[in-house]
Amino acid sequence: MIVSLNEAKKYLRVDYPDEDSIIRKFIHTGETLTVNTLRKPLTNTQINKVAVLYVVAYLFEHREDADMNELTKSLRYILSTEREAAF
């Protein structure tokens, strides 16, 4: 994991343990989406951390109404300089 539970909780401003399980799932989802968007293995860089934290925050805030198309477009934009070209 390139983002720890504590980093994610600090980013989300969550101080209580009640949400730990769901935040861990969001971190895993964020890393998976980041790898899929990058089209290469995940490395521990600042831009990749930002991307994972963006996904975590988006999913945390939009649990009931997450628009995965919007999320994916934003993630592509964030990672555009790192993304492998595909033909």
Which residues fall in each region the model found?
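Divalent metal-cofactor coordination and adjacent catalytic microenvironments
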Residues: 1-87
